[in-house]
From Swiss-Prot:
The gene is MT-CYB. This is Cytochrome b. InterPro entries: Cyt_b/b6_C, Cyt_b/b6_C_sf, Cyt_b/b6_N, Cytb/b6-like_sf, Cytochrome_b, Cytochrome_b_C_euk/bac, Cytochrome_b_N_euk/bac, Di-haem_cyt_TM. It comes from Eunectes murinus. Its cofactor is heme b. Belongs to the cytochrome b family. Heme b b562 binds at residues 75, 174. A ubiquinone binds at residue 193. Component of the ubiquinol-cytochrome c reductase complex (complex III or cytochrome b-c1 complex) that is part of the mitochondrial respiratory chain. The b-c1 complex mediates electron transfer from ubiquinol to cytochrome c. Contributes to the generation of a proton gradient across the mitochondrial membrane that is then used for ATP synthesis.
Length: 370
């Protein structure tokens, strides 16, 4: 439809009548992004990117800065909310075939990579024990790259070990990357409205559309209100629910935590990394766990867009969702049996979903012909 961007500005964008609550997570991600930028700015004003002062500056923000505890907790728990929303957003895209809008899907995958990088850099900034060791383990994976690995690692660290230059670089990257995320998000929305949103049926909705405002704005506001209430409840009553106990101790390069692990939203990728007992193989599997999302639009073989009428694919999809949760769970456990074996099997099933996707589509087409 021509002039969709102009119509969107006035809330008159025609949208399918049957899009469900699963389509609300895009606007919720926008709200999360706004919250993160605002709280992040106020935290950056008081934060000191120095290995001797970073941990103390976080304590100073929490104890001495007016409403600093609120800003710090909103920023930390807001990141978790961001990832909950983005994982549901991706799952909806996979289930309802939104990935067939290729440009939007590929820009979204790039957004996910950028978001994960930003969150990783942010996790290092408090310079707690788990921050330091998670940074050491993850950045050390660069050394697995043939020929260039050691040079790249030294360049990223700013020396031969994680030290003050590393923290300064990570703070600079954590500050600048959100602006890239905002730019890419704008491109993502523009590309989406070139073709328009999909819908649960996966059909062309041109014959049955309504203006975005007021119908879908109120629907979005309801979910935003629920998310805000949930966020404030966690901030008020359980602000440390997603934090690692080790991160309440200042970073000590001489003491290794019993079990090094990143934030919960990276555990699925970390679990896949851990399931391969080889450094280069693990690093490749970690990268592929995200990059493989880019292959989905090109391996779709079914004549139907949505999984709504595809029982075989529905079963495969929910197995994939369960696999994601199992990998996350095993990554929280020590590297010992039976967790290692469960993690390896779940990691295999994770990649098997993307391989079985085109096969299932082809099989369903065959069944429909008979």
């Amino acid at each position: 439809m021509p002039h969709q961007q102009i119509l969107m500005l006035f809330g008159l964008l025609p949208v399918a009548t049957n899009i469900s609550t699963w389509w609300n997570f895009g606007s919720m991600l926008l709200a999360c992004s706004t919250l993160q930028v605002l709280t992040g700015f106020f935290l950056a004003v008081h934060y000191t990117a120095n290995i001797n002062l970073a941990f103390s500056s976080i304590i100073h923000i929490t104890r001495d800065v007016p409403y600093g505890w609120l800003m710090q907790n909103l920023h930390a728990i807001g990141a978790s909310m961001f990832f909950i929303c983005i994982y549901i957003h991706i799952a909806r895209g996979l289930y309802y075939g939104s990935y067939l809008n290729k440009e939007t899907w590929l820009s979204g995958t790039m957004l996910l990579i950028m978001l994960m990088a930003t969150a990783f850099f942010g996790y290092v900034l408090p310079w707690g024990q788990m921050s330091f060791w998670a940074a050491t383990v993850i950045t050390n994976l660069l050394t697995a790259i043939p020929y260039l690995g050691n040079t790249m690692t030294t360049w990223l660290w700013g020396g031969f070990a994680i030290n003050d230059p590393t923290l300064t670089r990570f703070f600079a990257l954590h500050f600048i990357l959100p602006f890239g995320i905002i730019s890419l998000s704008s491109l993502h929305v523009i590309l989406l409205h070139e073709e328009g949103s999909s819908n649960p049926l996966g059909t062309n909705p041109d014959i049955d559309k309504i203006p975005f405002h007021p119908y879908h704005t109120y629907k979005d506001l309801l979910m935003l209100t629920i998310m805000t209430i949930l966020l404030l409840l966690i901030v008020s009553f359980s602000p440390d629910i997603f934090n690692d106990p080790d991160n309440f101790s200042k970073a000590n390069p001489l003491v290794t935590p019993q079990h090094i692990k990143p934030e919960w939203y990276f555990l699925f990728a970390y679990g896949i990394l851990r399931s391969i007992p080889n450094k280069l193989g693990g690093a490749l599997a970690l990268t592929m766990s995200i990059i493989i999302l880019m292959t989905v639009p090109f391996t779709h073989t079914s004549k139907m867009r949505s999984m709504m009428f595809r029982p075989f694919m529905q079963m495969t999809f929910w197995m994939f969702a369960a696999t994601f949760l199992v990998i996350t769970w095993t990554a929280t456990k020590p590297v010992e049996q039976p967790f290692t074996l469960i993690g390896q099997m779940a990691s295999m099933l994770y990649f098997l979903f993307f391989i079985s996707n085109p096969i299932m589509g082809w099989l369903e087409n065959k069944i429909m012909k008979t």
